[in-house]
Each structure stands twice: as structure tokens, then as C-alpha cells.
């Protein structure tokens, strides 16, 4: 679609008469412990989108504290729309509605992240120990969510000193130590933070050391030992209405892993592997922002490395991947009578380097992509009960391949979400987007196994996506529920065949619906989610081969949290269920049916009255020792002499002690 037509569509949506809606937010009254007060939230509230009201997921700091996740599987264990495949930390892949997170605009503290480099590596980009908030905006994403938001956006936000300091204090520290059975081993997290004369700072360290775990049948799963060594550092300074934030994150995972971490091959062995990530960013904002001047300026640098050196087998071979991503964003938010408008530009350059296996006649390859974009997003609440979030962006994309061939193009994207509130208990909404993705390189790890003749098809073109969603939310004084229908289509993705890089001819699609419900009564919270999704490539179901699109079928979660204030205790449990998947396409490709499974996790937490700054916790994952592999894992098949899944851990107990000073 031409840019002028897209601009007309965006302008039309900005002028449309549309509806506002409400969801329910839980807010604890500090005057009476345990009393719950619910206040309405519209889809647009104070110029911000309410992600949950349109079928998305939000994990707050309190949610993360309840879960105390050791990995991203546990982080998203209560979300049926998000599936995480199993294995060691670097192998975990996150899929939203069956679409791997590389299809979403992923950021950490506002910094764009690199896509998954290889279909046998994981997609997690952040240590859960550092997190304070996660937003998963599934489907139509806002224009200021970033470039390439084909299927939505995932925003991870890490803690800072102001989040952890006790009221009235200028220095604090936190120490968390745990021991887990079934190979989990020891985990330790230490943080120090302070505030003085407008300067705040934080330093946090987290490390794990364990062994390979066993599945529910007692079989050792190779390459799964915990081996994280991570650092988070932050500093902020406020002066004369200005604020500058600087952040650094470093992650290392060095251990013996399977050659292809997400699948078990016949006679498979472990081999030394190191995965590393470094990220630096600096951001400028105003603490005394006005209606017309509320700027945000950010610059960043990311580096991702994958080292598998000197492997002797030519079929798999050496594999060294290096990525450098750097860029920035400049934007301003304008406040008007009915809401806010954010406008700005963003830009980035992504450098790729591959070291092919030793017998290849093209040992090294270097290539890069560049992007520059302009965007605007408006979020409005009207007095008549209507609300609207709509925006557009225009991007230029350039791709220079390993043969110095250059491809360039530009395109526009547009989005809109509207809602209407019938009364204080019912809301309806609908949203849509068309997104221009630029040149998508995706699973570029294939390049490491291509010879000197490998080239880019001269007709290689940018990708594109369409999203549609609609739903209804219900709410009362102590309960809420909702349903969201979704339909996402992505085309123009890359295809690395044996001779060239070209476009995949298939259109990939995920469609279905999600349900959610929550009930709150005094100290008790009960919640449930259900997701049904059909994921296809063209007219056929996608195969369970750990690709960018995976079948998830039917999935559900049920959870409960209970506070027991008389004993300073909290207890809770989560049940996750996945239905059986069987289809003719997978059978024809020699995959076995994927069995159903049900997994229960539980925890208990106690604050001893005599030591108020100490918390003791015991958790159990997979309480009933179910033998299963997580949905979106590489499914077992008869191919290559028999491929096995990387099975999930069996019953695992974790004992944790935390001190806060």
C-alpha cells in the first residue's frame, strides 16, 4: 500500500468517533490491610495504553515477586498465551500465540533487542532476577513500540534504586540465596543501591551453579545445567528538571550444552558453549515536563555473541555468531485536552558476523541492516465514553549482504484500537494494524553452513504483517473477565535455501481467541486464562520443529494466591494445562502426536516476626512429577534416526532465604 493511502487511513482513524472502555485494576487500601478497592481503567488511561484490556499480558513487580521465577518458563507460567520451550537457559524460546518473540518488537528498558540468531538457540534476552515489569502487547502494536512489530511488542523493564529503597532511606541492600533439588543447585543474588543529592545508583549481581536436571521419568537431560553469571548496573542523576539515566547489563552462560540445544539427536553429546550479551544505554528525560515539552532521548549499544569453537564434526561444525546493534530514539509527548500525542524518530544499525565451520570455502561473512523511521501515536479519551489509540510510522530499511550487494526500500505502517463503554461493567474494543517490516533476516544462523556461492536473490523484498483483534471485557466490584479474538498474518519472511537467501512464499498466520478471569475476595486472588490458537503456513498447520511459528493448540492456566496475615504467610499455586495436538501434516512429516500434560507449581512464603527484613520461601515446580515437554519445544519424530524432545524438569524443590536492609 502506498504511503499516501496509509496516511489517509491513519488520519481517518484519528478523526473517527470511537469508544472508551474499562477494565479492573486491583488497588490495596493501605489503611486496612487486606481490604481491596477496585477502580475502573479505560483502554486509554492518562495517555497510556492498557495492555491487558485488549488481550495482552502485564506482569507487575508484585506478580514477579510472587513467582520468584528462576527462568522465563516460570516467569510466564500463569499465561496461557505465552509458551516457553524447555532445556537449559540459553535454549529457551518464547512464543506468543505460537509466534516466536523475534516476530515482536522486543525491548529491555526501551532498548531494542536482537532477534533469535538460530533456530536451535533460545530467545530469552533478560535475567528474570533483574525484572520489575513485563508487558506483552499481542497483535496490533502502537507506532512508538518500535520498528518491526509484526505481531506486537514485548517490553521488559528492570529495577532501579528508586524501586528498591525503603521510604525515607538513602541506602539499601538485598541478598537472596537459594538451593534447589533436581540439578537446580545454588543461586545467589546481591544488590546494593542508594540515593544522595539527586544521584541514585544500583548494582546487582546474579549467578547460578548446578547440574543437569532429570525429567519426570528420572532420565538425565543433557546440557541443562544452570550456569548464569549476570550483572546489572544503573545510575541516574536529576538536576534543574533534567534526568539522565545510564544502564549496563552483562549476561554470560558458559557450560557444556547439546550441539543443538533444543533437540535430542541419536548419540548426542555435550560440547562447550558460551552465550554472551552486553547492553549499554543512556536516556534523557525531564522531571518537570509541560504539556508541550515532555522529551525522551535515548541511545544504546547491544552486543550478542555465540561461541562454539573448534568442533570437529563437519555436519555441525564451528559456529561463532556475533551481532552488534546500536541506535537511538528522539521523541516528545504533547498533552492535549483529550489525551496525548507522541511523535519522534528512531534509528538503528545491525551488524552481523559469522564464522563458518572450518571446511567451508567461505569462512567469514559480514553483513548489516540499517533502519530510520518517523512515528506518531495518539491516545485519546473523550467525554462521551469513547477512546482511541491510533498512529502511523514510516521507515527506511537498507540491507547490505556478504557479497556487498545492497537492497533498500521504504514503507509505512498504521494502527488503531478503539473501544466503547456501555456502562461500568461492560466494554467492547476492536483493533487493527498493517506493518511494514523492512528486510527481515530472521534465522541468519543458516549462513554459517553455506558455501562461497551463496547469494541473495535480487528480488528479495521487505516483510509485512496484518493484525486484527476484537473483544469484550466484563467487570464488577471484585471480579473481571474478558475474551479477545485475534488474527495475525506475516509474509515476506526470509528463506535460506541451499543456494540463496530469498523470501519465503508462505504467509504465516495465527488466529484464535483468549479468555481471562479473575476473582478477588479479601486475602484471596483466583485467576484463570485459556488460549486456543491455530497456527498455519499457507493452508497447512505449522510443524513442531522449533521454528518461528509453532503449533500450540489449546492451553490453559489456573492460579490462586492466599495471604495469611495472622501468620505473616503467603501461599499460592499454579496449574498449567496443554491439550493434545495431532494433525495429518505433522504425521506426514514423521512427527509423533504431542500428548496433553498438566503441571502444578506451588509455593509458601513466611516473614518471621522476629526478623522483619527476612523472608523464607519454599517452592515446588512440577509437584506431581509429570513427564512432559513444554509446548513449542521441538517435538519427537522419526527423522534423522529418531529425534527426541528436550524434556522439562521433573519435581524440583527450591528453598530460598532473602534479606533486605
From Swiss-Prot:
GO terms for MF: siderophore uptake transmembrane transporter activity
Signal peptide annotation: 1-23
GO cellular component: cell outer membrane
PROSITE patterns in UniProt: TONB_DEPENDENT_REC_3
All copies of domain TBDR plug, residue ranges: 48-159
Function noted in UniProt: Heme transporter.
Descriptive protein name: Heme transporter BhuA
Gene this protein is translated from: bhuA
